[in-house]
Amino acid sequence: MPLYFIGLGLYDEKDITLKGLEIAKRCDKVYAEFYTSLMAGTTLEKIEEVIGKKIIVLNREDVEMNFEKIVLPEAKEKEVAFLTAGDPMVATTHAELRIRAKRMGVESYVIHAPSIYSAVAITGLHIYKFGKSATVAYPEGNWFPTSYYDVVKENLERGLHTLLFLDIKAEKGKYMTANEAMELLLKVEEMRGENVFTPNTLVVVLGRAGSLNPTIRAGYVKDMIKEDFGKQPHVLIVPGKLHVVEAEYLVEIAGAPKEILEQFAPRKM
């Protein structure tokens, strides 16, 4: 019997596609995980109401260590759905799960849904100009990750934008804000001193992507770090070289300083 990886979309229970909803409704068993992303506009109960089935929520250990014991044996006998926020295959963990299913002889299918990788276009930045993305992680004990700083540096050297995901500690109900991410990047800058991320760096914050009223703000770190971007989830974007239309969009829609337009010659309207 098949295993269906079904995306729930970005914000609430209405983001699932008709195809995903139809398949989830007919499955014999429905599992889900919410530790890789946050759907701020809904609850488990609302999703269950839409699907019409009880959902078994798995934690990180269940998914990463015990998927073969919990989910895959069921999928050999029944139609099973595995629900995830966003698009199922954006999280590398889910790609690995599909490999495990194949090795255990379980046929699997992917039902796509809205993803942050497409929704980020609402910032006005051109999708084809994004480079490698990275996650800004909370330091823990003696561990202070800095790889995201290197990703920003590499992308800026190529004139590319950087999409930064922000750390999630779902088991603690802790979701990093864009402000915290900027603070961490500034700390790394203090340690490295490579002039990659400074108070004068232009950044874009997107909050609650997929909702009807997302936060879209652009400005310099020294100003943005003090702003309230509302409820999480947030993503932080460090723009690379801007096209004139991108710059105009950031000014008109995201409230960026008009001075970012000074590098461009006046446009003929």
Curated annotation (Swiss-Prot):
E.C. number(s) listed in UniProt: 2.1.1.98
UniProt keywords, alphabetically: Methyltransferase, S-adenosyl-L-methionine, Transferase
Gene Ontology MF terms in the entry: diphthine synthase activity
Biological process per Gene Ontology, one example term: methylation
Pfam families: TP_methylase (PF00590)
CDD domains assigned to the protein according to its UniProt record, in alphabetical order: DHP5_DphB
Catalytic activity: 2-[(3S)-amino-3-carboxypropyl]-L-histidyl-[translation elongation factor 2] + 3 S-adenosyl-L-methionine = diphthine-[translation elongation factor 2] + 3 S-adenosyl-L-homocysteine + 3 H(+)
Entry-linked SUPFAM superfamilies: Tetrapyrrole methylase (SSF53790)
InterPro entries assigned: 4pyrrol_Mease, 4pyrrol_Methylase_sf, 4pyrrole_Mease_sub1, 4pyrrole_Mease_sub2, Dphthn_synthase
Protein task: S-adenosyl-L-methionine-dependent methyltransferase that catalyzes the trimethylation of the amino group of the modified target histidine residue in translation elongation factor 2 (EF-2), to form an intermediate called diphthine. The three successive methylation reactions represent the second step of diphthamide biosynthesis.
NCBIfam families from the UniProt entry: dph5 (TIGR00522)
Complex and partners: Homodimer.
Record protein name field: Diphthine synthase
Native source organism of the sequence: Pyrococcus furiosus (strain ATCC 43587 / DSM 3638 / JCM 8422 / Vc1)
